Structures are given as structure tokens and as C-alpha cells.
Amino acid sequence: MPFGWGRGRGRRRKRRMIGFLPQVRHFYPAIPPVSIRQPPIIMTYEEFEALRLVDYEGLTQEEAGKRMGVSRGTLWRALTSARKKVAQMLVEGRELIILPQGNEVVSDEE
């Protein structure tokens, strides 16, 4: 299906520039928790890239937003969501799976 089709109502999602595809896309606890198994946490490539640029590369939110082709506010929302998901994974001992949304464009601009 072409980009932007079949999403229903609302605006089309803007393309996100991704500079690095994660080599490992599935994280799980070495020792599963004894409690009832919870569903995995799903992180998007957009959230992963925001986390990588700001927390790993040390870019400002403004610089990271420009690199991804989004506003600082959009970058902030993706970064906040990614940080929450990582914390949830660590605290609750849940699986984390990183998946594309279909609106990412891999760029070699570093």
C-alpha cells in the first residue's frame, strides 16, 4: 500500500529521517518475571532514533529534530515516549520490540 494510504481519517504522517537502523530489535529479560506474562512493549524506529540522537549522540532536541526532519515538539514527544518505554521495560522486566511504522526514510546524513 502506498505511503499515507489506508490510515483512515486525519492527516498523513510526515516522513521521518532515520540515520541508523537498530541492529538488535528485540530485547527480553534473561530471567522472565514469575508474575503473569505481560505483552511486549513496542517502540517505533522514530522513538528509537530520537533516543539515539539525544541521549546517545548528545544532540540537542533542536538539532535532533532537524536531522529527523521534524519539529522540536514532535521530537520531544517521541523522545519522552521512548524514555518511558525503556524505563517500563527495565522496571517491569518486559520485552521490548523495535518496529518500523512505514513512514521512515533511511538517510546516510550523519
Swiss-Prot record:
Record field: transmembrane: none
Gene3D superfamilies, sorted: Winged helix-like DNA-binding domain superfamily/Winged helix DNA-binding domain (1.10.10.10)
One Pfam family from the record: DUF134
Disulfides per UniProt: none
Source organism, top-level taxon: Archaea
Cited PANTHER family: PTHR37478, UPF0251 PROTEIN TK0562
NCBIfam families listed in its UniProt record: PRK04217.1
Family, as annotated: Belongs to the UPF0251 family.
Protein name: UPF0251 protein PYRAB12660
Organism: Pyrococcus abyssi (strain GE5 / Orsay)
